[in-house]
């Protein structure tokens, strides 16, 4: 039984299979999966939760929403025992978002008769968002090989970067990162990236820039002097807008911190396309795990 915990677990052929399904769904293909899914979210979410829920319902999958505050985890029940409960109740899928890193996970996944979908675990992984970003880029550019993609912002705490970079690497893209030195992880070289100290040089280099928000809820110390100084040094300002070719953001956008409030939705922005692509890509994930 398949699960999707990390984009690192996917082969090139599996990524291509998911993207093929996503393209078909976006073009209007209809399909029914007679199954049930628990959406277990113990962290706030708008786009991801609603996107997974709408994708499931369009496929005919019955959905049941459980928030962390409503579950027995607040009484001390382990995440594994919660999953065992879902298994015992006969659910087919569990889509989960949790504040901790779900690792190691392979033995746990093997022991459960469930299709698990990681919708974000701490700073670790968010594979569906990585696939959405990859699908959006591929849809726009056609060819990913040698494409220059720059991630800007809080790289250290970003599960979106950790999910998207391996997929882009797999298909031959060139990846750059830029942000405050305090927010660039020490092991960033394992992702095969170029590090830019100057965001303006990075923007000149890149075909598309993915801005990431400051993960303030995960920052246990002060990594930047102030949000205003961060925006001036790394944000998408009106001056930088003139130079940037295309840009993305997985959301939620912190306006006037990540991106100028007037520039979130423009002719150069693919942000709304990322949101729209959430439905076909997540439908594709459900189908991929079902087959």
UniProtKB/Swiss-Prot annotation:
This is Aspartate carbamoyltransferase catalytic subunit. The gene is pyrB. InterPro entries: Asp/Orn_carbamoyltranf_P-bd, Asp/Orn_carbamoylTrfase, Asp/Orn_carbamoylTrfase_sf, Asp_carbamoyltransf, Asp_carbamoyltransf_Asp/Orn-bd. Keywords: Pyrimidine biosynthesis, Transferase. GO terms for biological process: 'de novo' pyrimidine nucleobase biosynthetic process; 'de novo' UMP biosynthetic process; amino acid metabolic process. Coiled coil: none annotated. Heterododecamer (2C3:3R2) of six catalytic PyrB chains organized as two trimers (C3), and six regulatory PyrI chains organized as three dimers (R2). The keyword Cytoplasm does not apply. Belongs to the aspartate/ornithine carbamoyltransferase superfamily. ATCase family. The lineage of its organism: Bacteria, Pseudomonadati, Aquificota, Aquificia, Aquificales. L-aspartate binds at residues 75, 159, 213. GO terms for molecular function: amino acid binding; aspartate carbamoyltransferase activity. It comes from Aquifex aeolicus (strain VF5). Pathway: Pyrimidine metabolism; UMP biosynthesis via de novo pathway; (S)-dihydroorotate from bicarbonate: step 2/3. Catalyzes the condensation of carbamoyl phosphate and aspartate to form carbamoyl aspartate and inorganic phosphate, the committed step in the de novo pyrimidine nucleotide biosynthesis pathway. It comes from the Bacteria. It catalyses: carbamoyl phosphate + L-aspartate = N-carbamoyl-L-aspartate + phosphate + H(+). Its EC number is 2.1.3.2. Carbamoyl phosphate binds at residues 47-48, 97, 126, 129, 251-252.
């Amino acid at each position: 039984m398949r699960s999707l915990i990390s984009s690192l677990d996917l082969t090139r052929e599996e990524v291509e299979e998911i993207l093929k399904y996503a393209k078909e769904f976006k073009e209007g293909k209809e399909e029914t999966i007679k199954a049930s899914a628990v959406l277990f979210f113990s962290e706030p979410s708008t786009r991801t939760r609603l996107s997974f829920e709408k994708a499931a319902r369009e496929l005919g999958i019955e959905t049941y929403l459980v928030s962390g505050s409503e579950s027995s985890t607040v009484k001390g029940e382990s995440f594994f025992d919660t999953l065992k409960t879902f298994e015992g109740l006969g659910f087919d899928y569990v889509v989960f978002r949790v504040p901790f890193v779900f690792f190691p996970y392979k033995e746990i996944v093997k022991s459960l008769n469930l299709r698990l979908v990681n919708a974000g675990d701490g700073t670790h992984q968010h594979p569906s968002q990585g696939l959405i970003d990859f699908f959006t880029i591929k849809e726009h550019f056609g060819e990913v090989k040698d494409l220059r993609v720059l991630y800007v912002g809080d790289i250290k705490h970003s599960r979106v970067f950790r999910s998207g970079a391996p997929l882009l690497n797999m298909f031959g893209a060139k990846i750059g990162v830029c942000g405050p030195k305090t927010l660039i992880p020490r092991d960033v070289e394992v992702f095969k990236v170029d590090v830019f100290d100057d965001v303006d040089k990075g923007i000149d280099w890149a075909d598309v820039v993915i801005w990431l928000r400051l993960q303030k809820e995960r920052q246990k110390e002060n990594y930047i002097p102030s949000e205003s100084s961060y925006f001036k040094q790394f944000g998408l300002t009106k001056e930088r807008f003139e130079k940037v070719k295309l840009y993305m953001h997985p959301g939620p956008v912190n306006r006037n911190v990540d991106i100028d409030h007037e520039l979130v939705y423009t002719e150069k922005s693919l942000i709304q396309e990322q949101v729209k692509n959430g439905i076909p890509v997540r439908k594709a994930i459900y189908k991929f795990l079902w087959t």
